[in-house]
Amino acid sequence: MDVTALATDYDETLAEEGLVSATTFASLQKLKESHRKLILVSGRQLPDLKQVFPKLGIFDRVVAENGAVLHDPATEEQRLLAPAPPPAFVESLRKRGVDPLLVGRSVIGTLVPNEMIVLDEIRRQGLELEIIFNKGAVMVLPSGINKATGLMAALDELGLPVDGVVAIGDAENDHDFLRRAGFGAAVANALPSLKKTADRVTLAPAGDGVAEIIDDILRGDIAIADASKNDVAIGKIARG
């Protein structure tokens, strides 16, 4: 199957220390010129992404807040894919001194080791929320919301099958994302556990690793099997 789209994480995948290099951006432009789609999938809030990467318009869709927000840069339309954080829950975290405490449209963000307080409040209030780690960051989201669900929402709007997508990431919150795509790649600086999930690990780290994958897509060196890894075999017909 042909590669129809590249979906990439932002921090320490596309970007290093929050910045995308000119070389990496040029690679994105080359892929765009090949009439393939570009999707950014990040745990960051959308206003934050716009600030650190003003050229967000190169992407056909942006999935922010770890799958909770879907954005179309061409129209500036946004779609919330998950409910807002419970106000009482947010207030309880503030009262218990959780700092930093970043509240998005759906995601709540903080840092390790605050996850113990967060987990205690989730249990105490009986909330259906999940804690997702991203290296030293801690994200709290409604159950079932992740980068994979956000990717699927983006592909639905673009009218593309997931089997033709190459996904690339580096951290804990990229596992489902890489598994769901037709082909999953981990950059060289990715966590060891994600490298085990990936179909391939790049030789170069971060943005250079993304450029490496793009070069291989353009050369036709990445082949996605016609039988999706997401399909489940439920039986076999014996002949003879």
Question: Where are the predicted features?
Answer:
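Asp-based phosphoryl-transfer active-site loop
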Residues: 2-18, 178
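Short, well-ordered beta-strand core segments
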Residues: 6, 31, 62, 184-186, ...
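HAD-like small-molecule phosphatases
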Residues: 50-156, 230-240
